[in-house]
Amino acid sequence: MSQLQSLRGMVDLLPEQTRRWQAVEAVARDHFRRAGVEEIRTPLLEVTELFARGIGEGTDVVGKEMYSFLDRGERSCTLRPEGTASVVRAAMQHGLLNQGAQKLWYAGPMFRYERPQAGRQRQFHQIGVECLGVSSARSDVEAIALAWDLLAALGVQGLELEINSLGTPEDRQCYRAELVAWLEARRDQLDADSQQRLTTNPLRILDSKNKATQALLADAPTLLEALSPESAQRFAQVQALLHQLGIPFKLNTRLVRGLDYYGHTAFEITSDQLGAQATVCGGGRYDGLVEQLGGPATPAIGWALGMERLLLVLEAAAKADPAGAAAQLTMSAPPEVYVVNRGEAAEAVALSLTRSLRLAGVAVELDGSGAAFGKQFKRADRSGAPWAAVIGDEEAASGVVCLKPLLREGGDQRLPLSDPAAIVTILHSAPKSSLESEEER
């Protein structure tokens, strides 16, 4: 019988990787707590219409990449391909929009049927922030600063912020007509995908990865040139506030977000840790989405970062600077004590001691192999624990445990098993030298 494997693009997270993810999530959780951003959790499965209406029928996400199916009630359901639409749906459904401005964050898996590659899988994970009910240029910059400062706190180096303004729907409509006319005159120079997008979603051509198309677009009209005076003034405010906060940025007039609901400020944050500028975070303003989904007109801005790409960047940062924040983040904390035990009576006593110490708040790793003491001590050394708690049948019969220091010179200490508080005190102290231990005897 053949061995079962995970689906292509659906990757297991093993314990070492999971520790890194938990460390990133812990930093993010604390970062958001200090900013007054509250966590929200939404279902993985939503009605397909949510994304068709929210993301846009003409997008690649809806047209080519969603995992959709009919359930037993003949309802079309979709595994969420992104987090924003679900958060907005939840805020509408539960009346959060009636309670004033909302700052929400989420973390979890998303699903898109794409070609798997490093840092980009079919099941991928995001950490995202959605600020609902805020309309000012200042709120745009606060959202950008939240993302920028989180990445800096995680130890990501070589950060670069790119910004653009997508203006209002009216601005984009005027620009769309101008861009289409310009591109139609050069249709034969476009790649096949861009030729198709010319009629379905022409703004997405600006984001083409085709080098020939990108070279052609160097002379194309820009959206910034089509902004109304009000939109241009708003974007100038965003830039001024970024300068005020000392967050460096550059204008990218070709920057468009991949989803239809974006308008006004759009941004991406990249890092050069992987050798080339790789996008680790993207977002923007989406004032029309709530109304598009059947709710009241509600201004909003948000962003998301991809965990898989971020972890690759952090691993590169840790290698480049072994003493830096990224390296510290990816290190796992060792147990405080490793319990070495052998013998039928000893194993039962060791289990009781382990539980008592854990209940007292001590991080304990119990060796359950039953191997010879020599092999267990090798594992104890590899664990990084500063102490080994040794229990053989002799110690079990005498009702004692032998505490042996592993990371520095020091004498063994024998303590009664009936006094776990004394054992905890020793474990939380520096090991004593052999001479000190002999004097106490």
From Swiss-Prot:
GO terms for biological process: histidyl-tRNA aminoacylation. Disulfide bonds: none annotated. This is Histidine--tRNA ligase. It comes from Synechococcus sp. (strain WH7803). Homodimer. It is found in: Cytoplasm. It comes from the Bacteria. The keyword ATP-binding applies. Pfam families: HGTP_anticodon, tRNA-synt_His. It catalyses: tRNA(His) + L-histidine + ATP = L-histidyl-tRNA(His) + AMP + diphosphate + H(+). The gene is hisS. Belongs to the class-II aminoacyl-tRNA synthetase family. The lineage of its organism: Bacteria, Bacillati, Cyanobacteriota, Cyanophyceae, Synechococcales. GO terms for cellular component: cytoplasm.
